[in-house]
Amino acid sequence: MSFFDSLRQKAPFLDKLADSFTPTLTRDEKFRLKYKLPANENILEDTNAEVSFATSIKDGKGHSDRVNNKGRKTAYVYSGRLFLTPHFLVFRDAFDHSSCVLILNISTIKRVERSPSESYEFALLVTLYTGAKVLIQFIGIRYRSEQFCDKLKLNLKENIPNAKTLPAFLETSYSEFLIAKNILGKKDITVPRAGLGQHFKYPGNPTMVKEKAKLRLWFDYFRENGRNLAVVQTPMFRKLIRIGVPNRMRGEIWELCSGAMYMRYANSGEYERILNENAGKTSQAIDEIEKDLKRSLPEYSAYQTEEGIQRLRNVLTAYSWKNPDVGYCQAMNIVVAGFLIFMSEEQAFWCLCNLCDIYVPGYYSKTMYGTLLDQRVFESFVEDRMPVLWEYILQHDIQLSVVSLPWFLSLFFTSMPLEYAVRIMDIFFMNGSITLFQVALAVLKINADDILQADDDGMFIAIIKHYFQTLGQSAHPDSSDIKYRQITKFQELLVTAFKEFSVISEEMAMHARHKYEKGIFQNIETFMKRTQLRHMPKTFNLSSDDLSNIYDMFYQSIETYKISMGTGSSNMGFEVFIQFLSKFCDSCRPCEKDKDPAFRKQKRNFLQRLFDNWDSAHIGELTLNDVVTGLDKLVTVDLLQAINYFFSLYDTDGDGELHREEVLQLSEGLLLLTEPWKSGRYVDLLTKKRIEDDIAENIIKESGGEIATMNQIELPTGVTIDEEKYKVEQAERYLKAASNFLQRSFEYAKAVDLAEEVNLIDLSDDEGEEKRTVKQKQLESIKANAALDPTHPKVIDLPTFRMIILADETYELFFSNTLRSSVHVDEHVNIDNKNKVLRSMFDGILADGKRVAEQVRRRVDSVATRSSIASVESTPTAAASSITTKEEKYDDLDDFTSEHQPENEELLQSSWFEIDDANETSTKAIQERSFEPLSANSSEEKSNLIEFEA
C-alpha cells in the first residue's frame, strides 16, 4: 500500500507539473501561425539560402538600382531559411527572423531561371509580376537544392489556374493603384473600392499634410520592397505601422498583416457565393444580428445610413453561415463596424475569419471562453507587474474584469475614440493578441496614482473613462519644455505599452492561458449546467440529482459538443442516443445476444420508436429537454402511468387502439426490455424473495424450529446458492409471461365493426388529404388482422391492455418496479465500468444479514407476508450620412509626381516611434554585395530556364 500512498501524495505535484507545460504544436502549425498562412499550407521543402532583391521601379532620380563607387550594381543580401509550401515561397533571415521576411505567393511569379554565376554557385533568378527580381543563392548540398527547385517547378505548373486570377485581384489593391498612378503614369485607372471612410470621412481630424506624408512613406516602401502579395517585410515596415498607417492604406495593411489577404485570394468569390446561397434564409444568429445593427458604433455617421447598415449586415450574416458553430456573438458587430470603415465587405469578412481563428480564438464564441481566459491571464500579469496596485484592487473589492473585459472584447473600439483605437489595431494585427495585454497594462500603469484613490468600481470606471476621453491632450501640460509639452497622452500610452511592457511575449501569454484554462473551463461548464438545469421542464419523477446526472451523461455522450467552448451541436442523434441509454439502462447495455442480427434489429427498432417518441420537434435529433421529459415518463412510480406510456409508444395514430401488427410489435418490445432478467443477468424482486425464503427455510430446518427471538438467529457463513436453478426459474417465468400476454391479447381483443370503422365506399369529397390517409392506414391495418378472423378483425384498447398486464404477476412487477429500477439515472456513470455478474448479486443478498434474519423470524412466527423488500434490482454502477465636400476631398493625396515632401522625413525621425528592440537596427545579417544582372541574351537561353513562364 506504500506505493499507492506515495502516488496519492505525489498527485498534486504532478498536476502542477502538468500545468507548466503548454500544448505542443506541430512544425506546420507553428509555421502557419507565425506567417498567418491559410490552413491548407504545409512545408514541402526548406533549405538554407541567401536572398537579394532588385526593384524594377526607378527612384526619383531615374535610377532603379544601387550602384557602388565602381559603377557596379549592388543589392543587400540576406542569409536565412527558405520554405516552400503549395502556394507560397517564404524566406526569413537567420539573424533575428524579422530583419527580412518575404511571404511570396507563387501566383506573383512570372519567370524562374537559373542564374549564371562566376563561382559556380547554384542560384535562381525569380522575376515577379512587377518586374522586380529576387536572386536566390542556395547554400548546402547540391542535390537538396535541385530537389527544392524541382518541387518549386511542379508547384508553379499546378498553380497556373490560380495565377490567371491575379490581375482581377490586384485591381482591389490600393498599393497597386499608388504605383500605377505615380510610377506607371496611368490616367484611366479608378480608385479601388474601399471602406465607408472613402465616402463618409475617416475618424478623427487628420491634417492633409500628415496624411499625405504617411502615404508618401508607404509609397516609397512599396516602390523599393514590393507590395501586397509580394512584399518584403523589413524593420522599416514595422516602424511605418507604429508611425501610423494612412487611412486609405489601413484596410490593405490590416489584411496583409493578418493573413486575410491570402485567404481572400485563395477563396475568390466565396463571400458573394455565401450571401447568394443563403439569401432569404433566417436563423437565430440573423435575428440577433438585426437587434444589434443599430447599436454598432452609432457615433460614426455611416452607421446612421442604410448603406452602412447593409454592409455590416452582409458581413455578419455571411460569417454566421460560414461558421455556424459561432454564428453571431456579442461585440462582433462593433469589431466589424470598425473594419468596414477602412475595408470593403469582402476584406472585412476574411479579416473577421482570421481574427476569430488566429488572433483571439474563443473571444467570439457562445461562452466567450477566450475572453474570460484572457481576463484571468491579464489579472495575473497585473499581479506580477504591479503588485501594489493589485493588492489595492483586492482590498477594495474592485472588479478589474468589469473595466477591462470591454477592452478585450471590443478591441478598444468602444473604449477610446476611434482615431486612437484604429492605431491600436494597426499594431494588433502586426504583433498579435499580446498587444491587448500590453496596452491594458499601460493604461493601468499610467493611471495607477488615480486608481489608488478609488474606493469602488464606479470611481475606477470614471477614472479610466476620463483618461480615454483625453487621449489627444498633452500628457505633460505644465512642463516648461515645449517638445515635452507636445507629447500627447496617446503617444505616452504607446511608449509605455511597447517599451515598458515589451517583456510580455506571446510565449508568456500562451503559458498563462494553459495554466488557467482548466479552471476557466470548469467555471463555464458549471455555470452553463446550473443555467440549463434551472430552465429544464418540470419533472415529477426525477430529482435534482437525477437531472444533474442526466446532464452529465447527455453531454458526455455528444463528443462533438464542447460545453466550455460552445462549439458543435448540442443535439443528440440516434446513434449517440443508443450509446447514451447503454450507460445507465440495463435493457440497453451491450450483451451476448447483440451478436444475433435478429436481436440487434429488434433492439434498434424499439430504440428508434423510443427516439421518435421523445423527438418533440420532429427534427431527427433530441435536445436535453426532450431526453429529460422522456426519462421522466419512463421512470414514473405510478403503475398505471407506466402502462399507459408503454401503450402510447405503439399507438402512433393516437386512436387508443392497437391492431394485430402493433400488438405483435409491443410484445417484441416487452421481450426486449425483459431480456436482462430472462437471460439471468439480473434478478427481480420475485426471484430475490424466493432466494430469501429458501435461505430462511434452511435456517429453520437447521435450528429445528426452536428460534424464539431475533437474537437467537444465527446466519450461516457459507451458504451456497444454486444460481442456475434461479436463473432457469426466472427465465421460465418471463417466457410464460410473454406467452400469456399474446394469448390473452388475442382472447380479450375487441371485435371491430368494419361498417363503423371504415367506409369502404367513400363518396365524400370534403375531407382533407391527411384524414383520408389516416383512414387508408386503418383499413390496411384491419385487413392485416385477418389471421385472427378474416370476417371479424379485432383490436385491443388501453383498458384491455391494462387488464392483461395486471393479470400477470411478472409484468405487473415489471411496470411497477423492475423497469423503473433498471434505469439508473440516480447513479454516476463510468463508461469503463463493467457490469457485475449475477454472483455478486447473490453475494450482496447474503451480506445483508439483518434482512435475512428478519425474514427468518417472520417464518418462525408463521406470519404470512408479501411486503416488498427495499433493495436495488441491478447492481452495475456507471457513471447620418456625411458625404465629403469639395474642400474635404484630397484629390492629390495619392499623387507623388511632385517633389518629395519633407514632412515624411520628420515623421521618420521622431524618437517616439523607436520602440523596437535594439537588435532590429543591427545589420549583421545584411551584407551589401555586387549584384550581377542577367544580359538580354543569357536571360533568354532555354538551357537556364526551369521551364516555367506564365
UniProtKB/Swiss-Prot annotation:
Region annotated Disordered, chain positions = 878-950
Q: Which SUPFAM superfamilies match?
A: EF-hand, Ypt/Rab-GAP domain of gyp1p
Instruction: Say yes or no: keyword Kinase present.
Output: no
In the UniProt record, does the keyword Acetylation occur?
yes
PROSITE patterns for this protein: EF_HAND_2, TBC_RABGAP
Q: What's a Pfam family in this record?
A: RabGAP-TBC
Residues recorded with modification N-acetylserine: S2
Where is each Rab-GAP TBC domain found?
Answer: 244-432
Give the highest taxon in the source lineage: Eukaryota
Please give one Gene Ontology molecular function term for this protein.
GTPase activator activity
Q: Can you say where in the cell this protein is located?
A: Cytoplasm
Q: Name one GO cellular component term.
A: cytoplasm
Task: Give every EF-hand domain span.
Answer: 602-637, 638-673
- Phosphoserine PTM positions: S764, S871
Q: Which residues form the GRAM domain?
A: 29-116
Q: Which UniProt keywords apply?
A: Acetylation, Cytoplasm, GTPase activation, Phosphoprotein, Repeat
* Other information: Present with 768 molecules/cell in log phase SD medium.
Listed under subunit, the entry gives: Interacts with MAC1.
**Protein role:** Stimulates specifically the GTPase activity of SEC4, YPT6 and YPT36. Inactivates YPT6 during recycling between the endosome and the Golgi compartments.
UniProt protein name? GTPase-activating protein GYP2
Mind giving the lineage of the organism this protein is from? Eukaryota, Fungi, Dikarya, Ascomycota, Saccharomycotina
